[in-house]
């Protein structure tokens, strides 16, 4: 029960992050290698793609977990799917923390 609440909470956090990035129109930068982006894609678009990808991985892990509970999926697939989703979520959280840290540092700069 706790895990399902956490997955819903994680999906909500990802969707809010994606919406915030899309609304703010964060400046352009080169995309990380993990997320292929079109040439000239903005930083906000790259983050939106990344959050969408992580959200899909979380949903796939949840579906695989349910199949595992029913006995339709092998334990190895369940563990692999959940670990992949967890790693992706941790990456997004680390990026979010760095963005917040950079924003706070910029906001403290004298004008």
Swiss-Prot record:
The gene is fliE. GO terms for biological process: bacterial-type flagellum-dependent cell motility. Its main location: other. It comes from Brucella ovis (strain ATCC 25840 / 63/290 / NCTC 10512). It holds the Pfam family FliE. HAMAP family: FliE. Keywords: Bacterial flagellum. GO terms for cellular component: bacterial-type flagellum basal body. GO terms for molecular function: cytoskeletal motor activity; structural molecule activity. Belongs to the FliE family. This is Flagellar hook-basal body complex protein FliE. It is found in: Bacterial flagellum basal body.
